[in-house]
Amino acid sequence: LWHNFWLDRDNVSLQTVQNPRYVFEEFAARPRPAAAPAAPADELPPFDAFDLDPAVLAAQSNEILTAVIQGARKEETSPEVQLAALRALLNSLEFVRLNFEREGERNFIMQVVCEATQSPHVAVKVAAFENLVRIMQLYYDKMRFYMEQALFGLTVLGMRDPEPHVALQAVEFWSTVCDEEIELSLEAAEALEFNEEPTHVSYHFAQIALPEIAPVLMELLTVQDEDSDEDEWDTSKAAGTCLGLLAQVVGDHIVALAVPFIEGNVKSPDWRRRDAALMCFGSIMDGPESKLLTTLVTQALPTVLETLHDPSPAVKDTTAWTLGRM
């Protein structure tokens, strides 16, 4: 267990925090079974075997965070060490709430993670975006400054990344934003019902970013593999889910962006684009007000019914799903 590595096993104590690189070099250099030889950083699996023990984190969060952040910095020359540090950070985020309350420490953590999203090593980039997803989930109320300064741009770039694992995590970031803002909206409605002030405030990140992120999500719907497993989670499925959550947050505002995409692709010669158009239409059903939605469905129904006879099995499946949502 990782906590045994941190605490005195093999004569390693918490004084090792003074030399954090040593710890992560040890992780990166640990022998692997013959069936699993050492892999390049871009192919390294998650460091599940090194999950941090919650009890250790609660007691030693400052010292461990210092070591982790030092190893995760862009100045680190070993991608394996940086990846191990980012994995450790991901596991420790829940336990460093006091550090996130302090602006200087929070700024440094966010700087290190944001810089890691620009790493030339895919596994490091993926781990950095995984951290951003978790940070948004845990510390939404602290993210306004960072969204304005960096996260809007970084995550849009991430969604456009040609490496699907990077794009997937960038999409998950916005799904998390939407999840948080849906919860905040429900909380605000409940507070209003009792004539109270809500405990937390929404910064409406999704609404602000809508013109930038919605078109990217719609294009990601076209990135399907005809032979992919139906149950396999991929960028296209993640984009559809995110688009649905986005529609719930922004309501009618999604329509002006979705309709041109749907109309421009539903009769495309490329089955992927036809499928994406139908997926887009089905995904936004929970967003607009019922009156506007009724108008949309009435106008679109004849075209959607035509696609039940599409030569592509994938398109026919998506048509059936969309009709079930209408």
Regions found by a protein language model. Give the residues of each.
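HEAT/HEAT-like alpha-solenoid repeats
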Residues: 1-5, 31-73, 100-117, 144-158, ...
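Hydrophobic residues within the alpha-helices of tandem HEAT/HEAT-like
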Residues: 1-6, 16-28, 43-49, 85-96, ...
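Short inter-helical turns and helix N-cap capping residues of alpha-solenoid HEAT/ARM repeat scaffolds
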Residues: 8-9, 13, 76-78, 120-121, ...
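Alpha-helical scaffold domains
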Residues: 11, 80, 91, 134, ...
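Acidic, Ser/Thr- and Gly/Pro-rich intrinsically disordered linkers and low-complexity segments
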Residues: 76-80, 194-197, 218-236
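Long, polar/charge-rich, low-hydrophobicity segments
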Residues: 124-126, 153-154, 159-160, 172, ...
